[in-house]
Swiss-Prot record:
HAMAP family: ClpX. Keywords: ATP-binding, Chaperone, Metal-binding, Nucleotide-binding, Zinc. One of its GO terms (cellular component) is HslUV protease complex. Component of the ClpX-ClpP complex. Forms a hexameric ring that, in the presence of ATP, binds to fourteen ClpP subunits assembled into a disk-like structure with a central cavity, resembling the structure of eukaryotic proteasomes. This is ATP-dependent Clp protease ATP-binding subunit ClpX.
Amino acid sequence: MANNSGSDSKNTLYCSFCGKSQHEVRKLIAGPTVFICDECVELCMDIIREETKSTGLKSADGVPTPREICKVLDDYVIGQMHAKRVLSVAVHNHYKRLNHSSKNDIELSKSNILLIGPTGCGKTLLAQTLARILDVPFTMADATTLTEAGYVGEDVENIILKLLQASEYNVERAQRGIVYIDEVDKITRKSDNPSITRDVSGEGVQQALLKIMEGTVASVPPQGGRKHPQQEFLQVDTTNILFICGGAFAGLEKIIAQRGKGSGIGFGAEVKDPDSRGVGELFTELEPEDLLKFGLIPEFVGRLPVIATLTDLDEAALVTILTEPKNALVKQYQRLFEIEGVKLTFTADALTAIAKRAIKRKTGARGLRSIMEDILLDTMFELPGLEGVEEVVVNEEAVNSGAKPLLIYTEVTKKKDATAS
């Protein structure tokens, strides 16, 4: 018996990659001198699939074309065509500049981007989608939490630490990443005149951001927190990091309108009432001087040469956001109900009513989820305990009047109820 077991172990074949025996896997494929199991083949396919996905958009010089970038942005962000074109060209030129930096004596300067638009219009989503398209490390920072070095709050260089963490501490990858700084309109100077007292969360933060946005070698403590002399630091060159700043800039439209008031003089001049124009229309007339009046310092405005303005989302755009993108809210909730074995349907009137509520709240696309949660909360609470429900229909009454969505039961359940009665 001992000899038989010994000969069996000699005849057992093993995967040359993971070491599993032929009895532990479904299939073992033989090569000239090696074997590979089905599990290792699947793993290799996954790796190749990921590599293909990340390089699929790359053009001949390794950078997607502006048209390709814009096409992918269209899948996730509804409307905002002008902003998407501006971003696509700026990002394409930025990474083209990196790939061809040593091929000529002409030095191409970096073009950081400023996104201006009302709350919930897609600023953050645009930045996140760009990073995904380009397969580069991406991090977000909230400008309102930042303070000058030495004061209580988050140090500006912590932004670079977050980017390092996103790149798994690969310094080279981090140096080609994208940083999105949100709420940048909240760090404006508190008055038009330079102050004699320290403004550590306003102008002071703008001054601190200038260095890393223009390009400097930042000394970043690997564990974060405040610096001390005994620490080891990671050196990160920020010259090639693309900075995208975003903000709602509430009140900026009034500054633009005020500047435009004096444009119409004489009998033939067309005088347009500023109040009759929407915020988005006024933003298209933005000049750097308007940002200075708003409270950004000249040096900070100078570091953001590319400005993309986004408009308010109208009713039709919000309905499209609810239904069409790959990760549309309606699709997400339909998937949740599908897990329970129930079909979720929204009537056209219901979708329009949801869009109208979001416009009334002035929260843009960001407010759509909270409205959907309000409508479906009771149904999602009760549904797991109900039997025989095959469909839930959300109509206009459920949105506007607070009525419960309609529950449609299977024929079997109806017959049971009829028999019981």
